């Protein structure tokens, strides 16, 4: 399924912050691929978050730089302005998602088909996922509920990632399992997060070590969410 391979690894990062620049450099160094989920009406805006008594930059990448910075990776929907979709009516849910998809498609010059739900849990429900499937051009949508699993999932509109990128113990445990697997059916190792979170405890080096560990395996296909989920 994955270029003749049974195992595939993919990453997914939200918000389109300037820390993505460093992240892309690391991913490219090790031949890894990610999907980056952007809010088109927030692009270029300055911002910061107060986390653990630290002020962490949450400044968004400028629209004019998107194509260059994310070259070789996938761009996907994260809604126009990052609302909690469970608090919105149906029409606004559709507008937030479909207009973001159209904006990003126009910006990138190709059709955007992926999505990640914005905000902390609960940030979606089955009614919302059905609205997305029925009324937008989105073909898959990722949740923030990690399942610690590699199995293929039937419902691509409530797609659960395997692991969160800062859960190091779980990440390495799953990575060891994934590397050792000799599956007869297709398996996906899906990792998600936000690149600004590496700044909180300065964990960039730890992430690079993980990338080095999981990369360059002959039996693993390294691709974007779209390449793997819509194969």
What name fits each language-model region?
Residues 1-3, 29-31, 35, 40, ...:
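C-terminal domain-boundary segment and adjacent tail
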Residues 22, 82-178, 202-206:
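Catalytic domains of cell-wall/extracellular-matrix polysaccharide-remodeling enzymes
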Residues 66-73, 134-142, 214-217:
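Structural recognition of alpha->loop->beta junctions
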Residues 68-69, 180-185:
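Short glycine/proline-enriched loop/turn "hinge" motifs that connect secondary-structure elements
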Residues 1-74, 103-118, 190, 219, ...:
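Active-site beta->alpha N-cap acidic-glycine motif
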Residues 75-82:
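Histidine-centered catalytic micro-motifs
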Residues 13-16, 79, 195, 225:
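Active-site metal-binding loops of divalent metal-dependent hydrolases
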